Amino acid sequence: MPLFYVISHYFNLPFRAWEQRKLGEDVNFLNGRAYSQKELLDKGKYKVLRVGNFNTNDRWYYSDLELEENKYANRGDLLYLWATNFGPEIWNQEKVIYHYHIWKLKIMNINVSKQYLYTWLITDKERIKQSTNGTTMVHVTKGHIEQREFQIPPNLAEQQKIGTFFKQLDDTIALHQRKLDTLKLIKKGFLQQMFPNNDKEIPNMRFTDFYGIWEQRKLKSITEKITRKNKELESTLPLTISAQDGLIDQNEYFNKIIASRNTRGYFLVKNGEFAYNKSYSKGYPWGVVKRLDNYDMGVLSTLYIIFKPTKINSDFLTKYFDSTYWYRAASQFATEGARNHGLLNIAASDFFEIELNIPLNNEEQKKIGLFFQQLENIIILHQNKLEKLSILKKTYLKKMFI
């Protein structure tokens, strides 16, 4: 049974066939203002809203220009990003000037609900992506978008119910995202407080009944380097390191096979062993270290450095490498400016010379490791809830419009 019928029936709305019209018949796509770089100010009366402000760029430019009213976006306005990362957005902040790569949508037909139109445009974005092999880097022309045919219930009340339904779902997703972000900030804060800052012997925050100073130990004195190869093809599972998800199946992560078909020359990594990925990325300037938790074994390229803990609690070591306290030591062994094709030039012998500041009391190590593992489990639980809600929304959108 189509979802639009379910909603019509559930809300006691009369069922009528949906109409199909061109967007340009009901919606006016208003151009934003083009700015030269010299017109963009560091301070001013109005913020200038650019495409990047919806994504990863949190830097704002300003303008003191007084423009005609249709060049401003106000709270509640429906916008459409037509360049780079394209798609609809509802602006929910203060009055801004919107940039040239953004349209403001002015609905000309009083029988078209803004919230419904926003929801339909989300599904249309997915159709456009599919027609361009899934890329989000698309330039949508005004002529093209005005000719897009959209389906709409003639009953305004039905449109509003549909729009409200998805808005409530979006609000629930946003709430769970905020909870997840807060939990990650809490974890980050505890990592900063429960490990000693550089040159300090004790952390700012500590469990009761532990008093001794933390001492420095070289990684080589508390771990063992692993050089085991996959000669007998004990594993055919190629692994990769994700900064967010740890050591995971390479085929699933990239959605294709990256590793060589012959993995005999790869390292064989077993559950509980650690791998250092020397690839640097945003937020991880010295690479990442992760433990293999999700599989019994797997194979990794010899570009990785593999080791296992021998004289340190494994959970504690995992959380130590989740922090940034080892960055300073790692930076001392990397030649200045020597970063080759995204890889740091840290030799394995140098990596094991890294000094870690650790509590010598094994019980304290265990307690710290357990504390962060429990916090991580809560974070994973919220991540799973968020993923399920996102899947639910996609399913409803598909049932509704496609």
Regions inferred by a protein language model and the residue ranges of each:
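Feature detects amphipathic, helix-rich regulatory segments
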Residues: 1-402
